């Protein structure tokens, strides 16, 4: 890690971890707010009242603050790669549960539990700090935070169109299911990566433990 500049166009070693991390963060926000741009269709499907819609929006963020503390503790105990993988895996099935919901109560429960996905950004901060030296960590975390936060905007821009492409009264369900599928893809990619604690991936795929300075 002797280079002083970060090559963002590289897709190997620590830069690959950066790209996986920001996309994982992106997906957490994409899933966390996947219901918001589709709320009109959800309201129509379940004949929701204004109060019920407000409740779904509130429940979606209710767990986030305690979740960030809990996720931080888990990262300290088990490492960021494992925790990110588990969070995305669990959140994908919460997306499926929301998409297949057949009552307001089921919708509300899934949205409440989805508050945990808002803690995803905590994991990446730790992961980036482990993979990048001090002279690069600021830029790396800027890329991580900047692109990751775009997830909620991307959901608002893309999911209504995706729902229309699927068509029919269940288009919104398929659009939300798709966000869960994307999360599973990232989980599979994460599980192929090394733990990364002060590590450098060599060209032959082996991991060399080094001191990050």
Provide a role label for each language-model segment.
Residues 191-213:
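Flexible cytoplasmic inter-helical loops of multi-pass small-molecule transporters
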Residues 66-104:
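Conserved MFS/SLC helix-loop-helix module at the cytosolic interface between two early adjacent transmembrane helices
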Residues 110-147:
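Cytoplasmic helix-loop-helix junction between adjacent transmembrane helices
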Residues 94-98, 114, 190:
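MFS-fold secondary transporters
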Residues 33, 61-69, 119, 153:
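Residue-level signature of mid-helix packing/kink "hotspots" within the transmembrane helices
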Residues 103-111:
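Short hydrophobic/alpha-helical segments at membrane-entry points of transmembrane helices
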Residues 16-50:
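Extracytoplasmic
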Residues 144-196:
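Helix-loop-helix hairpin linking two adjacent transmembrane segments in secondary transporters
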